[in-house]
């Protein structure tokens, strides 16, 4: 199995649907005996540039270990889900479990533990 980092951006009007989407994707990974090493909900953030006249979006980060077939299935699900504005999948060499730099000093939600965490800005 290979390691991947996935970030997807959800339309701000669909922010309430993000937990259900994440659960669906977690199920797809678990059914293929994959592992989720890191799952973070970055919340609504300002986009660097407007996408379809939208200036803010809901961000989610996942670090997973699974087969390439499951990643293709996830990307197909992203493509056919109109709520997902953009997605990016990167193959990594090893599992990443520490908090991402995007969380620096801000309150964010780690979806694996289900608890809110306060990251310390350095």
Curated annotation (Swiss-Prot):
Annotated SUPFAM superfamilies: Ribosomal protein S6
Signal peptide: none
Family: Belongs to the bacterial ribosomal protein bS6 family.
Gene3D superfamilies xrefs: 3.30.70.60
GO annotation terms (biological process): translation
GO cellular component, one term: cytosolic small ribosomal subunit
Role according to the record: Binds together with bS18 to 16S ribosomal RNA.
Keywords linked to the UniProt accession: Ribonucleoprotein, Ribosomal protein, RNA-binding, rRNA-binding
Organism: Neisseria meningitidis serogroup B (strain ATCC BAA-335 / MC58)
Pfam families xref list: Ribosomal_S6
Protein name, as recorded: Small ribosomal subunit protein bS6
A GO molecular-function descriptor: structural constituent of ribosome
